[in-house]
Every structure is written in structure tokens, then in C-alpha cells.
Amino acid sequence: MVKERKTELVEGFRHSVPYINTHRGKTFVIMLGGEAIEHENFSSIVNDIGLLHSLGIRLVVVYGARPQIDANLAAHHHEPLYHKNIRVTDAKTLELVKQAAGTLQLDITARLSMSLNNTPLQGAHINVVSGNFIIAQPLGVDDGVDYCHSGRIRRIDEDALHRQLESGAIVLMGPVAVSVTGESFNLTSEEIATQLAIKLKAEKMIGFCSSQGVTNDDGDIVSELFPNEAQARVEAQEEKGDYNSGTVRFLRGAVKACRSGVRRCHLISYQEDGALLQELFSRDGIGTQIVMESAEQIRRATINDIGGILELIRPLEQQGILVRRSREQLEMEIDKFTIIQRDNTTIACAALYPFPEEKIGEMACVAVHPDYRSSSRGEVLLERIAAQAKQSGLSKLFVLTTRSIHWFQERGFTPVDIDLLPESKKQLYNYQRKSKVLMADLG
């Protein structure tokens, strides 16, 4: 029998290996809202969390219980009370909160403990621990309204948490915490997840929502937001009366976490199977990241970037789209190159060759990774090269191309005669390639 060759699996694994190495030993805080726990895909999410643990990632899982608490209140005909969009937890509500949280604690612990069953890692033991790692205090009275047993974090026992994580345990935290006087308080899962991520200096905080992430006006996923942009989204939703959706609650915490040193916060769908793995082990992810600095950067190339540039341009050279460059030539001309990198992978490049006497420059070796050719990376490179040319005192920019004539024309370049090229460039013109010459004024 001939076995089926699964090339997609091979390619996917090759691309995921750098992320496996990067994530190993790092601390991730995962925030699971009650809505995610109720969804039919929750078992798959738990299995993926178990897989992350098996890869050496230190995990803190924080679960919420909002819909479960509301269901308990409804079943006992107890009206939920809110003040300024915060739940007022009276004595009766607290008992129902503890009931919901306790049930979820046992259920999630059991699921995590068996998450590696029916896998090659079956038999590997996952130790799940919970405890009084958080000390709570009451919210108190606001505008004459007593929040009763609704609370906030007073302090976190970071040392105890680190000891558990270093021992290889998954830490599971729920919405109920005790005070120094032994009273129980109801806390929000987003506050717990956010403060744990900050105090533990977590690499990532990950949250789940019903959609694939934050969307723009066209309904497309926004792959990256800075904290000020995320804050604006929160305020816009609050103006519409949305204070407690999973997306808003997570973004609120993500803004605070990023500004306090957590490098990346990820918002993904709890409805999509494998979303957690796709987000963490692929270059572009599948949801929305909130970051202090972009995962993507544009900069001048250095000698260390030669390997990445060669890997990017070789296929285009083999197709005859680009003129072939040897490694030695690239080493000598590396200072002329600008690259776009994403997660340390070169995804686009271009070079500027100035001709100072004629006050003209050539934009050459323009290449964009196939995965990003429908994006704006080409325009970004063109803008950067044009800016460099103007800073160098050049007044015109030209390109030689056999395939991208219309692309450059759409961006202000016009076809010109070969005679308008700088004299030294004209002498090197390859009449066999018959490249078109296009030129633009830099203004």
C-alpha cells in the first residue's frame, strides 16, 4: 500500500519549529471566559493547552464563570445586581458564584488531566494546581452602593506561583479569592489574568472571544493593534453600551498588560478548532495581537541579513524576474538594501543604487514573499526607498522591470527611453532581457 504524502503537514511543521524553540520555558497566561467553556469546541481547546504544556511552556489558566453564574441566579430566581457595570455580589450571589466556580474548577482540572489521552503522549502526567495565590480585598462602597463580596486583588504570591510553574504544573485560577480575614470575594477573570501576566512577567496573555479577533469596518481581521488603538476600540464599544463582552473585557486587560511589560496579548476565537495553535505557531497567526512594538519592522539590511535576502530572491532569480546576484555581490552591496522582517523572517526587500552626479537613483531587487504579495509591503518599500533617495539629494527614481510595469505605473512611474539612464547604467543595460525603464520624479 502506498502511503499518502502530506506535504502540507511537513511544511507546517517546518514553519512551526522556530516558534516551538522560542516559546519553550516562557510563561503564558490563558484567559478562558465562561462562554468559551460552554462552547462545544472547549474540549479541543483543553487538548491544545495540554499540548502547549508538553512543549515546555509554563501555563497559568484563568477561567471566568459569568454565564454560569447568571444561569445559577436565574435558576434560583435571584435578580443579578450591577452598579457601574460591575456585579454586586451579595451573600446569596456569593454562594451561587462559589458553586459555579467550584464546579468549573473540578471540570477543567479533570479535562486538563486527561488532555493528552488518545495522543502519542498518553500516560504523561499533567499536574494541575490551584490555591490561595491571590489575596483579595473588597471593592467597598461607591456612590452609596455597597459592592458586598465583589472584590479586587490586594496582592499576589508570585514566589509560590513561580515554584509551581518551575515544577512543571499548570496553575488553574478561578474568580473567587479570599481576603486576609478569611472572607471570600468575587473577582473578574480579566483582572486576575492581567495582574498575573504582569506580576509573573509573562511573555503572552491569551484570550478567547466569539469572533476571530478584532475586525475593521469591512469585517476583516485586524492582525495587530497598539495599546492606544485597542483602548480606542474599547471606548467605542462602551459608547454603544458594550461593557462586558469577551472582546471588550480582554482588550481592557490587554492594554494594561502591554503597558506594564507583557510583550504580546492575543485575542482568538473559541469557536475555531486549533485557533490557539495557529496563533502561536505560525508567522501571521489567526487572531488579533495587542503589542507595544510591531512584530514587523522595516530597516536597513546588515551583513547578518544576507541569508534571508538570498532565500527571498532566489526563486525570483530562477524565474528570470530578478537579475541573479551572487552572495559575494550581495555582501558588497548590503548597505544599499532595505528589508521588512516579521518575526525574524525577511518577507520583503529592495535596494537603492544612487547616481549622485545625475541626481538619480535606481530602485532594484524588489522582492516580496509570496504570502504577502497581496498586501501593501511593496508600497511600504517604495515609500522608504523614495524617502532615502530624497534624503540623499536625488530628484528622480528609476526601475528596470520585465514583469511589474503596470504596478510601477500605478504608483507614478512613467516609461522612458534608455537614453535617460545614467551613463554608467546605460553601458550595463542588458539588451537581451529588454527590461522596461520607468522613472518617477521625487518632488
From Swiss-Prot:
Domain of life where this protein originates: Bacteria
Activity regulation behaviour: Feedback inhibition by L-arginine.
PROSITE patterns (alphabetical): GNAT (PS51186)
Enzyme class: transferase
Record flagged with keyword Nucleotide-binding: no
Pathway participation: Amino-acid biosynthesis; L-arginine biosynthesis; N(2)-acetyl-L-ornithine from L-glutamate: step 1/4
Pfam families xrefs: AA_kinase (PF00696), Acetyltransf_1 (PF00583)
GO biological process terms, semicolon-separated: L-arginine biosynthetic process
Residue ranges constituting the N-acetyltransferase domain according to the UniProt record: 296-443
Subcellular location, record wording: Cytoplasm
PANTHER family registered for this protein in UniProt: AMINO-ACID ACETYLTRANSFERASE, AMINO-ACID ACETYLTRANSFERASE NAGS1, CHLOROPLASTIC-RELATED
Assembly information from the UniProt record: Homohexamer.
Official protein name in the record: Amino-acid acetyltransferase
Underlying gene: argA
